[in-house]
Curated annotation (Swiss-Prot):
Record-linked PANTHER family: 8-AMINO-7-OXONONANOATE SYNTHASE, CLASS II AMINOTRANSFERASE/8-AMINO-7-OXONONANOATE SYNTHASE
Coiled coil stretches, renumbered: none
Catalysed reaction equations from the record: 6-carboxyhexanoyl-[ACP] + L-alanine + H(+) = (8S)-8-amino-7-oxononanoate + holo-[ACP] + CO2
Record GO terms (molecular function): 8-amino-7-oxononanoate synthase activity; pyridoxal phosphate binding
Name of protein: 8-amino-7-oxononanoate synthase
The organism of origin for this protein: Anaeromyxobacter sp. (strain Fw109-5)
Record's subunit section: Homodimer.
Keyword annotations from UniProtKB, A to Z: Biotin biosynthesis, Pyridoxal phosphate, Transferase
Entry's family note: Belongs to the class-II pyridoxal-phosphate-dependent aminotransferase family. BioF subfamily.
Positions contributing to substrate binding: 23, 135, 354
Alphabetical list of SUPFAM superfamilies matching this protein: PLP-dependent transferases (SSF53383)
Length: 397
């Protein structure tokens, strides 16, 4: 029976519906892949973060099944109690080796890592500097830290320099996404690292959308730019390019030792399931052994970039297989998503509050499992859905 104290929720849901902002789940009837079954139809999947096409890889499935048989379905407890299993340590050692750091620590998700690490590093007498377009989990972690939150304009190195110089604090922490998830552009990490060196600030880089994709060994943007040794906190996810689940923080041994004691999202949660960690361990080996996967997805991204620019979209700053097809208002983005589905493509509309009002978009992503023909077919379908009058801004028909 519905309880009266929750009646306010009905009004909230009605308001969300009226604004076109109410969200709903839509389950897949197939594993992740370049083509998925949704709503009884098989559609080309252009909204997954499975960048290397590993989520349904038989090697990951086998590793997960073997780990479940060997170590059980669940971990049963926090790692500080009775949930620290052999596969967790094996994965952490492999991550540290891949990242070139002394140690690494697993978290249940990227949100857990970003929400838990900043509060372990800074507090009331400190300041944390965050790009205005950082992921929501970073913002939440900064707020939970109770440090002074100083937000700087997106990728604005000069403003960050001024703020670092003009903000007194016991400790200073600069936090940035490596690749920004809604726009696909890269942070100016070389310049940010230089500012952190100059001001004695710690540097935290969220490589969620760069891990496995960028860099000679798939280490991320910091590796690609040659500044990995100047990053104090490397955060990456295991559920995007690596196709499994969970996240990690890599860095100096003393950093990890502190997080084991102070990161509440590590201490007060059940350890990751053995199957997920084993799948991630298998994926990491594939990332190192098969660089052609990175080359493949980046080549497809280059093809998509050319096609979108031909249609009038500015994607010149995109540095990863993430493309913002910005259409403006929410209704226009939703209409485009529906029209593309009718043409066989699964692309979700991204609306406020995920992106700023007036920038609703289609967020188009690619994986190494896609083909050139699928990219070209999508561009053709998008051209049908959009009209470009007189070379002006694209709009939905």
């Amino acid at each position: 029976m519905a309880r009266a104290p929750l009646d306010w929720i009905d009004r909230e849901l009605e308001a969300l519906e009226a604004k076109g902002l109410r969200r709903a789940l839509e389950p897949l009837a197939s594993p992740q892949g370049p083509v998925v079954e949704v709503g009884g139809r098989r559609l080309v999947n252009l909204c997954s973060n499975d960048y290397l096409g590993l989520a349904a890889d038989p090697r990951l499935r086998s590793a997960a099944a073997e780990a479940a048989e060997r170590e059980g379905a669940g971990s049963g407890a926090s790692r500080l109690v009775a949930g620290d299993l052999p596969v967790h340590g094996a994965l952490e050692r492999a991550i540290a080796g891949h990242a070139g750091t002394e140690a690494a620590l697993l978290f249940g998700s990227g949100y857990h890592a970003n929400a838990g690490v900043p509060p372990a590093l800074v507090g009331r007498d400190d300041a944390v500097f965050s790009d205005v377009l950082n992921h929501a989990s970073i913002v939440d972690g900064c707020l939970l830290s109770r440090a002074k939150l100083v937000r700087y304009r997106h990728a604005d190195v000069q403003e960050l320099a001024d703020l670092l110089a003009g903000t007194p604090a016991r400790r200073k922490l600069v936090v940035t996404d490596a690749i920004f998830s809604m726009d696909g552009d890269a942070a100016p990490l070389r310049e940010i690292a230089g500012l952190c060196d100059r001001h004695g600030a710690m540097l935290y880089v969220d490589e969620a959308h760069a891990t496995g994709v960028l860099g000679p060994r798939g280490g991320g943007l910091a590796e690609a730019l040659g500044v990995a040794d100047r990053v104090d906190v490397h955060m990456g996810t295991l559920g995007k390019a690596l196709g499994a689940a969970g996240a990690f923080v890599a860095g100096e041994r003393r950093l990890v030792d502190l997080l084991v004691s102070r990161a509440r999202t590590f201490v007060f949660t059940t350890a990751p399931a053995p199957a997920a960690s084993a799948a991630a361990l298998a994926a990491l080996a594939i990332v190192e052994a098969e660089p052609e996967r990175r080359a493949r997805v980046l080549a497809l991204a280059a093809r998509m970039r050319v096609g979108l620019e031909r249609l009038g979209f500015d994607v010149s700053r995109v540095a990863a297989p993430i493309f913002p097809v910005i259409l403006g208002d929410e209704a226009r983005a939703v209409a485009a998503s529906r029209a593309l589905r009718e043409r066989g493509f699964f692309v979700r509309a991204i609306r406020p509050p995920t992106v700023p009002r007036g920038t609703s978009r289609l967020r188009v992503t690619l994986t190494a499992a896609h083909g050139e023909a699928q990219v070209d077919a999508f561009l053709g379908a998008l051209e049908e859905v959009l009209r470009v009058p007189g070379g002006g801004a694209p709009r939905v028909l």
